[in-house]
Amino acid sequence: MAVRSKSSKAWLHEHVNDHYVHMAQKDGYRARAAYKLLEINEKDKLIKPGTVLADLGSAPGSWSQVAAKLTGTSGAVFALDILPMEAIGGVSFIQGDFRENDVLAQFEGLLNNRPLDLVICDMAPNMSGNAVSDQARSFYLCELALDFASQHLKTGGSFLVKVFQGAGYQEYMAAMREFFGTVQTRKPEASRNRSSEIYLLGKNKR
């Protein structure tokens, strides 16, 4: 029988007693991360009826759930992930790597020449426990997301991405500023205090 480490026991205790976990269960969201997007959207009004957006690294789907509710039938939500994701009403899901040509072709076919207003990305790599390696892998995913956003967003569009503060953070912010008129930071209350995660919001794509 496996013995839990102190850190995993602490995480389990925190998870079981987490206010946002209980809210997610009550409200029908697949993960507590839904409230991060809801809080950011309350401030920045990124998603509204009619918004056309892509959710990168969407599984298990809580951000796509929020997006589908906020865009309504007049908008469109495209979710992409290499992992499987259970269907969500109002969400077009593509399973695959968004760097691959066949996946991009599927996405562009579904987009059908509509302007893309917003790209959201809450991706994180599977953590190995090696802080240096994990940080590098995290920013690699962020760079891929920025590349996708820079290629597909309409002029004036927005990009919301999760990053972890540390090595590479300032360089990534500088890269975002090349593509967006403004780059702002967001730390929603639903983000755990001990976490180094923060959200970068690029507005007014050039």
UniProtKB/Swiss-Prot annotation:
Function: Specifically methylates the uridine in position 2552 of 23S rRNA at the 2'-O position of the ribose in the fully assembled 50S ribosomal subunit.
Gene: rlmE
Pfam families: FtsJ
Species name: Neisseria meningitidis serogroup C / serotype 2a (strain ATCC 700532 / DSM 15464 / FAM18)
InterPro entries (UniProt xref): RNA_methyltr_RlmE (IPR050082), RNA_MeTrfase_FtsJ_dom (IPR002877), rRNA-MeTfrase_E (IPR015507), SAM-dependent_MTases_sf (IPR029063)
Keyword set includes Cytoplasm: yes
Organism taxonomic ancestry: Bacteria, Pseudomonadati, Pseudomonadota, Betaproteobacteria, Neisseriales
Protein name (database record): Ribosomal RNA large subunit methyltransferase E
Family of this protein: Belongs to the class I-like SAM-binding methyltransferase superfamily. RNA methyltransferase RlmE family.
Subcellular location(s) of the protein: Cytoplasm
Disulfide links within the chain: none
Reaction equation(s) it catalyzes: uridine(2552) in 23S rRNA + S-adenosyl-L-methionine = 2'-O-methyluridine(2552) in 23S rRNA + S-adenosyl-L-homocysteine + H(+)
Tree of life domain: Bacteria
Binding-site positions, S-adenosyl-L-methionine: G61, W63, D81, D97, D122
GO MF annotations, alphabetized: rRNA (uridine-2'-O-)-methyltransferase activity
E.C. code: 2.1.1.166
Keywords: Cytoplasm, Methyltransferase, rRNA processing, S-adenosyl-L-methionine, Transferase
A GO term from the CC aspect: cytoplasm
Active site, per annotation: K162
